[in-house]
């Protein structure tokens, strides 16, 4: 999911940069699909194509998930990955549009490969990223073998993750997107499940984890409650109405919320008669009351090293030397988690 326009209103004053180690002892509910997309887009071979095993199966997501999760465990973080379930009906049209966009990008990839344009291959390949049900199943298998808990959400993963954070079972939600704030997570941690370095043009920038607190966002934007934040996001555009209200940018949307107080009042006045492909009040209702489950666990268990070796080395052709070294790191990280105080969770 993504509410990028809302992110433009969240200034530096509410983005608290921290070191990874400062999150030691914290349980963080990670948006699994968001993380997998990041891995598939960023972990590439020099020609722009994803990592693959001998059978031609993509393994970028497994490589990213395996090594990045070990990094989190070494920092003392207790990750819980939350997977998307069935999307709401009003999201299906947007999902179809994204599928078409990815297909067009893939056509550009094939054309660039044929014409030998290596830079364009890398550029379009990132836009053509897709996640299959097989990739999801493989990710769940990998996490299970690692002893890392995962949760199957009934609907949106970020809604489930936010619910777990609101209940106090996780300290925060980890995602690059801001939707978890709309779903009510008290805290959002960005830049957790991504590479610590990112190339923008010719420049390589360092990405450090940043904490964004819901209450701090509301204060900074002078909003009374989460409902007003949801109203603001709907005006700007969400996954369910990506275009928002035409002609309404971040500052104008904020002023409208300040002046009229709610989306309902706006629909009765300045937006009366405006066309919306999706009923904005249905979107608001979903953000306030999404389907969630109480069937989840957050405890990190001992890894099954034999199963991990079989899965990564024999099934997917990972380097035996690299996997063995990583398993040693995983073993030590698990040992540290066992001895850490439970008080740090709170």
UniProtKB/Swiss-Prot annotation:
Top EC group: hydrolase
Record-listed E.C. numbers: 3.1.-.-
UniProt key word DNA damage: yes
Region I-domain: start-end pairs: 120-261
MF GO annotations: 5'-3' exonuclease activity; 5'-flap endonuclease activity; DNA binding; magnesium ion binding
Binding positions (Mg(2+) 2): 177, 179, 239
Similarity comment text for this entry: Belongs to the XPG/RAD2 endonuclease family. FEN1 subfamily.
Subunit text: Interacts with PCNA. PCNA stimulates the nuclease activity without altering cleavage specificity.
Name recorded for this polypeptide: Flap endonuclease 1
Organism: Pyrobaculum aerophilum (strain ATCC 51768 / DSM 7523 / JCM 9630 / CIP 104966 / NBRC 100827 / IM2)
Lineage of origin: Archaea, Thermoproteota, Thermoprotei, Thermoproteales, Thermoproteaceae
